Amino acid sequence: MDLSTMSYGCTASRDAEATLNLVLRALELSGQRGVLLSGWASIGKGRALPSHVFSAESLPHSWLFPRMAAVVHHGGAGTTGAGLRSGVPSVLTPLAADQPSWARRVHTLGVGPAPLPLQTLTAERLAEAIREAATSPAMRQRAAELGRQIQAEDGLGRISELFSQYVDRWGRLRRDQG
């Protein structure tokens, strides 16, 4: 039995209890153990959970995600970035804002199954997506490759370089117009 993270911490759900029940059923159907990150939404807080589910309000994504078979989340920019960097396939269940775009991008990159919008999500569809993410050799390999590429990037150095170029260009523009 593999281990998957379910992160719905800041997703505003009208019915957190229904979301929790769906997630628990999906884990059961998929044969996965789960780490449920409850976060701000407090999903599952104070409720007895099955023995194959561990719950925490928060854990560092950089530590947790690489240890998982799959990461299931809403598709916010931060969680998506952490998932991509971890080198582990992601199952995205977008709700609103930029989440659908990130979900499509993860799928297009080959590091996650097709997006499963939270509004129409079923336990059966989520379980199938978790199984696919956790067991697809091609998806796992592509996620690992992309994770290594992202980890090798010098993001801070690159943004510093781009910012310097921008400042230089702006300075030249002002002098030329001056």
Positions of the model-derived regions?
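Short amphipathic alpha-helical segments
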Residues: 17-18, 47-49, 83-86, 104-105, ...
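A donor-sugar binding/catalytic signature common to diverse glycosyltransferases
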Residues: 56-105
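Donor-nucleotide binding loops and adjacent catalytic segments primarily
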Residues: 1-70
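Residues at alpha-helix caps and immediate loop-helix transition turns in enzyme cores, especially N-
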Residues: 15-19, 102, 155
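C-terminal amphipathic helix plus adjacent low-complexity
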Residues: 123-178
